[in-house]
């Protein structure tokens, strides 16, 4: 028999396309028929975070990232908004963390819960919607396999891993290592499970030029490590302290998709009487802050006035 098989090598390669190859196809019909206001994969905001997407939340050491994370996951697990950032429904959330023991977690949970005035029914709901795990040993492939089992077992919508440093298991400044970990090892888990993945991360020392604060795009790359981190994630959030105030004040900037939120930057401060993050108006100066300002020194005179 003659004229059997492919006419050319290119035709042969085309015929060998796998199901995985076909799953990457997006047709013009798909694009035209997509309804962004009714996306079944939407989880939070106006398609801000979707199923299978990712976010990195970066901030300095000792500024309260753990309590911030606690407040976020409690609100979203209850189906409530975090300063205007609202989930489409109560989300099933899992947290894996390495830096706090059970007592630390309990203090943060109880403190934030008291600050948010959670009710008995809220607590009952959280028992179903929110899970915590402490894992301080596994890194790299072993950690990802552990997280994958957790996602499947608990049918998670969102998983938070805190911090990235503890679980990467390599050199975060090595772009090759970071790319393989995020794109070749973690991303398939997100595609398989459709979970939204949030890393908590440490920020490198902020570099300011000419006394000016960093721009949003500069903040996006402020997390310690390779720029591949910012390239990979759907959203980058950076918590940075502003000024010297009591209570301490911060800006939470959403650097990549903040335009999908009510506000791309949220002005936050530590609660004055409880463990809770509160929003403040940066244009309002209180009487106490005015008293803290140094009085004008009228003894200091210019040389040419003597």
Regions found by a protein language model. Give the residues of each.
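Short gly/ser/thr-rich secondary-structure transition/capping motifs
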Residues: 35-42, 141, 217-220
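Structured loop/turn residues at beta-strand edges in well-structured enzyme cores
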Residues: 52, 91, 154-155, 193, ...
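The Walker A/P-loop phosphate-binding site
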Residues: 16-114
